[in-house]
Amino acid sequence: FPTTVNPLIQNGFEPVFVDVTLPDLNLDLDQVEAALKKDPSIRGIVFAHVLGNPPDMDRVMQIVKDHDLIFIEDTCDGLGSEYDGKPLGSFGHISTCSLMKSASTSSP
């Protein structure tokens, strides 16, 4: 989603992209850990909960803790969804809801 990553670029950050797993389209947490090992200067994780289907949030939060990362979750595609009874958007240090035509929420 460009509306998830463009604000980072516009504010001088350099994103490091990782792939998703199939068929669930979740963030590939093995690739996240590999990227963190390859580049320890990475300071945060930002991703959107695709189709309201979150990755293993327990593992995400452990990665965040282990690497002292900032975690920003974009709930543009996950409004109303939960992980283990906890609403998406309540895990990260910051929660956003980006708007674009292909997301569940949009603006004119």
Mark where each language-model region is:
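Substrate-binding/gating loop at the entrance of the active-site cleft, primarily
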Residues: F1-V16, V20-L29
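Active-site phosphate-binding strand-loop segment of PLP-dependent enzymes
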Residues: L25-S107
